[in-house]
């Protein structure tokens, strides 16, 4: 058993227990969201130099050098003296500038954040309802847009998503984190074909990636497959078809798994439809966004279809357990 010293109080950390779980078990409130080392909401700082390297995966080198770590991924092997970072140093103030219902479940939230200097289309931010409650949402916008765009899907027991859908108003101010994440478009291989596969609101980062690639004159073929259980779950269909008509190298295929094929969409899961159309992905760059089970399965299938591992980029939308929504 190791000890955690926080604000001059000492807490016990059981063998194999994460710092986040240990503190939560003993009544300490630590901001958290995904609890899987992705969103970085639970970032803390150690006064010592004994931070396990795995607890710093995904953090910027400047943060690693200052002994910042992710509490959900830190399983200490020795005692640690830790602290929570000052939220004023890491959060940005944003104003709601637009609210647009995309379908029955998904709303597009527009945020103006003048202090945000730069980001990559397809990255994600943490949206804060209050100082301790946040959720991660991917950016559907590109840096040249006048405001950030998020696609927020309503979940039945989602404290954050229901608040966004039912209570958020244009003009409201809230706090967000700086964008993070590695699922974005990089120029430099303009002829490389791109395969984008998403489910549900996983279309959000793919929209950002798609628009960014087209804005940077990507010349290779770009194929986007967006899947839903039924046709009502699809959205931005007209906009995407219009883009496909405007850009000869862009092809859009909506997919519905619980329906037969029609002139409006293909029948089947997006990943299956995509890989049936593109069985050999050697030399392709692949982006996978949405349901984590789909992302996990599609990553394996893309690799077996000869896509290089370093050409497979993923953003899995991990749903928080109902008790913590």
Protein language model regions, located:
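Anionic-ligand-binding alpha/beta catalytic cores of soluble enzymes and soluble regulatory domains
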Residues: 84-86, 212-213
């Amino acid at each position: 058993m190791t000890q955690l010293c926080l604000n001059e109080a000492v807490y016990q950390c059981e063998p194999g227990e994460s710092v986040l779980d240990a503190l939560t078990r003993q009544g300490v409130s630590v901001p958290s969201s995904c609890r899987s080392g992705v969103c970085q909401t639970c970032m803390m700082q150690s006064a010592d130099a004994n931070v396990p390297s795995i607890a710093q995966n995904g953090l910027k080198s400047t943060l690693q050098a200052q002994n910042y770590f992710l509490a959900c991924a830190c399983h200490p092997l020795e005692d640690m003296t830790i602290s929570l970072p000052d939220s004023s140093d890491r959060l940005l103030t944003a104003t709601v500038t637009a609210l647009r219902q995309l379908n029955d479940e998904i709303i597009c939230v527009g945020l103006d954040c003048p202090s945000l200097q730069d980001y990559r289309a397809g990255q994600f931010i943490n949206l804060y309802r209050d100082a301790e409650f946040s959720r991660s949402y991917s950016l559907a916008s590109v840096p040249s847009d006048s405001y950030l765009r998020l696609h927020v899907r309503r979940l039945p027991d989602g404290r954050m998503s229901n608040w966004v859908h039912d209570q958020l108003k244009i003009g409201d101010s809230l706090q967000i984190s700086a964008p993070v994440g590695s699922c974005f478009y990089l120029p430099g291989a303009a002829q490389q074909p791109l395969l984008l596969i998403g489910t549900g609101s996983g279309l959000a980062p793919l929209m950002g990636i798609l628009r960014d690639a087209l804005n940077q004159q990507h010349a290779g073929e770009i194929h986007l497959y967006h899947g839903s259980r039924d046709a009502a779950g699809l959205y931005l269909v007209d906009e995407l078809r219009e883009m496909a008509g405007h850009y000869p190298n862009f092809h859009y295929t909506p997919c519905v798994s619980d329906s037969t094929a029609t002139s409006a969409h293909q029948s089947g899961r997006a990943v299956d439809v995509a890989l049936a159309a593109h069985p050999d992905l050697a030399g392709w760059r692949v982006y996978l966004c949405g349901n984590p089970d789909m992302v996990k399965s599609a990553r394996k299938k893309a690799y077996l279809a000869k896509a290089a591992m370093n050409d497979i980029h993923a953003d899995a939308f991990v749903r928080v357990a109902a008790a913590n929504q």
